[in-house]
């Protein structure tokens, strides 16, 4: 089962928090993030632990072999993010993760992570102007691309202060997928303790 997050700002933070919550709840949880900060292996995690170096090397060979086969048959060579996503899927499947938290790379509709046919949750953080040369030059165009992660049977969690211009495509995608949108109420959130690198809240 997959929990997927999209948006312009806050995807990485949301992914990390969600993964930590699911792990603490007892689920074996896979996580992909992009980009990494220090170590490339940060992009692949299970229960907060990065992929082991030897496992990364072995799975990289498998992915490269698959890419060679695709090219030999005249197919289009996958870009780096597509190859990295395939590697993550291989590892998560091999380790039999209960849940997986995926961070999209670019957009959503045509993103490599969108090959997943069913997602439990699609979380959309605040949408802003991002990769305009690919996604479009207006918020509604960008939102339409990002809302492409919404599938039938997926619960949508939407940022509470989403720009009005971005809401139309999100509502349309949810209606077409016959799914509901949950918009959290920030008034239900209480900051218990706030520090530079740590926040504790009650929701």
Which role does the model predict for each range below?
Residues 24-117, 133-135, 164:
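ATP-dependent carboxylate-amine ligase catalytic core
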Residues 18, 88, 170:
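Aromatic/hydrophobic pocket-lining residues that form π-stacking "cages" and hydrophobic walls in ligand
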Residues 2-3:
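Short, small-residue-biased leader/transition segments that mark boundaries at the very start
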Residues 13-17:
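Hydrophobic positions on the alpha1 helix immediately C-terminal to the Walker A/P-loop
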Residues 71, 95-104, 119-203:
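Acidic, Mg2+-coordinating active-site environments of NTP-dependent enzymes
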């Amino acid at each position: 089962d997959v929990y997927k997050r999209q948006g312009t700002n806050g995807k990485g933070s949301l992914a990390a928090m969600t993964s930590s919550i699911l792990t603490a709840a007892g689920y074996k949880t896979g996580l992909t993030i992009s980009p990494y900060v220090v170590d490339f292996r940060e992009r692949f995690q299970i229960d907060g632990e990065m992929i082991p170096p030897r496992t990364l090397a072995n799975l990289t060979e498998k992915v490269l072999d698959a890419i060679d086969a695709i090219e030999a048959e005249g197919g289009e060579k996958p870009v780096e993010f597509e190859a990295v996503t395939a590697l993550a899927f291989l590892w998560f499947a091999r380790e039999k993760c209960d849940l997986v938290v995926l961070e999209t790379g670019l957009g959503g509709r045509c993103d490599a992570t969108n090959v997943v046919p069913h997602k439990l949750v699609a979380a959309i953080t605040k949408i802003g102007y991002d990769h305009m040369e690919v996604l479009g030059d207006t918020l509604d165009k960008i939102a339409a691309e990002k809302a492409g992660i919404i599938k039938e049977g997926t619960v949508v969690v939407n940022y509470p202060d989403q720009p009005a211009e971005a809401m139309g495509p999100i509502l349309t995608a949810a209606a077409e997928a016959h799914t509901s949108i949950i918009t959290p109420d920030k008034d239900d959130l209480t900051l218990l303790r706030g520090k530079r690198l740590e926040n504790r809240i009650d929701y």
